């Protein structure tokens, strides 16, 4: 299902706000000690280090996380690239759709967007 990008962002934000209003109880210490940390889109602050970039994944690796979770979208020439949203607006401030670009033009526009192949090869 493809949602309009603005509707998708609205729904994601609404869901985040809903669940943040109902915090969960802190797990028992033993459960926390035994858990494996999976980094959601790497470790990022959205200012210096953007989500789903090699920098975010390298930082997660350096911090010793067990694994990383990532998202991917297809470029016009069917190269899977590691980007969460269908557009680059929220993360990179660019009003353009990932699927409108071939991989080379996307890399020229936004060099920090890696291909799925690059991420799998590195990690």
Over which residues does each language-model region extend?
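Phosphate-group recognition and catalysis centered on beta-loop-alpha active-site segments
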Residues: 1-123
């Amino acid at each position: 299902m493809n949602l309009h990008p603005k509707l998708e962002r609205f729904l994601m934000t609404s869901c985040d706000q809903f669940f943040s209003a109902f915090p969960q109880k802190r797990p028992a210490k033993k459960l926390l000690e035994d858990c494996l940390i999976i980094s959601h889109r790497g470790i990022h602050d959205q200012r210096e280090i953007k989500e789903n970039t090699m920098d975010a994944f390298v930082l997660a690796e350096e911090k010793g996380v067990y694994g990383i979770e990532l998202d991917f979208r297809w470029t016009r020439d069917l190269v899977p690239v590691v980007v969460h949203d269908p557009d680059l607006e929220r993360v990179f401030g660019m009003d353009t759709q990932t699927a409108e670009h071939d991989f080379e033009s996307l890399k020229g526009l936004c060099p920090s967007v890696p291909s799925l192949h690059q991420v799998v090869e590195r990690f």
